[in-house]
Amino acid sequence: LFYRYQDCTFFNKKDILKLHARFYELAPNLVPMDYRKSPIVHVPMSLIIQMPELRENPFKERIVEAFSEDGEGNLTFNDFVDMFSVLCESAPRDLKASYAFKIYDFNTDNFICKEDLQLTLARLTKSELDEDEVVLVCDKVIEEADLDGDGKLGFADFEDMIAKAPDFLSTFHIRI
């Protein structure tokens, strides 16, 4: 079972066992000790976002939703391992960028539009900017990152912007 995870993640067997222990700790009444007995268990988002690695993150719900196959934010062990794998230090920039894009695309239209940027900014600044400041920042981001001039950021625009952010890889990660 664990070899399968080793093949498609950035983890070794020890890491995967540690992740299973963490998953079990989140909901011991739901998750069996021996995962092979009941592999499709969904741990609710409300428990996942209480993890120390996510608790203070302003995007915790969006992060969990991005990895949730059921679309409700509930995670299976597969989803949980995927989340930690993408957010680990070993994951490549393009993989991290694709999930970051999903997280910031609040309206799920496959673009990061002005409204998505406003929601992102509100979370990052804890709504401390006034409306004019928010509009100014969002306009500036679109002006600088919108390569094709359509008034929104497609994935290529976003990826180009991320490539210019040297701290992206070091900030878009969590440790197990």
From Swiss-Prot:
Disulfide partners: none
Coiled-coil boundaries: none
Any one cellular-component term (Gene Ontology): photoreceptor inner segment
Segments passing through the bilayer: none
PROSITE patterns in the cross-refs: EF_HAND_1, EF_HAND_2
Annotated GO biological process: calcium ion homeostasis; cellular response to ATP; positive regulation of cytosolic calcium ion concentration
Binding site for Ca(2+) 2: D146, D148, D150, K152, D157
GO molecular function: calcium ion binding; magnesium ion binding; protein homodimerization activity
Sequence positions that bind Ca(2+) 1: D105, N107, D109, D116
Main location: cytoplasm
Function description: Calcium- and integrin-binding protein that plays a role in intracellular calcium homeostasis. Acts as an auxiliary subunit of the sensory mechanoelectrical transduction (MET) channel in hair cells. Essential for mechanoelectrical transduction (MET) currents in auditory hair cells and thereby required for hearing. Regulates the function of hair cell mechanotransduction by controlling the distribution of transmembrane channel-like proteins TMC1 and TMC2, and by regulating the function of the MET channels in hair cells.
Oligomeric and partner information: Monomer. Homodimer. Interacts with WHRN and MYO7A. Interacts with ITGA2B (via C-terminus cytoplasmic tail region); the interactions are stabilized/increased in a calcium and magnesium-dependent manner. Interacts with ITGA7 (via C-terminus cytoplasmic tail region); the interactions are stabilized/increased in a calcium and magnesium-dependent manner. Interacts with TMC1. Interacts with TMC2.
Anything else known: The binding of either calcium or magnesium significantly increases the structural stability of the protein in comparison to apo-CIB (calcium- and magnesium-free form).
Name of the molecule in the record: Calcium and integrin-binding family member 2
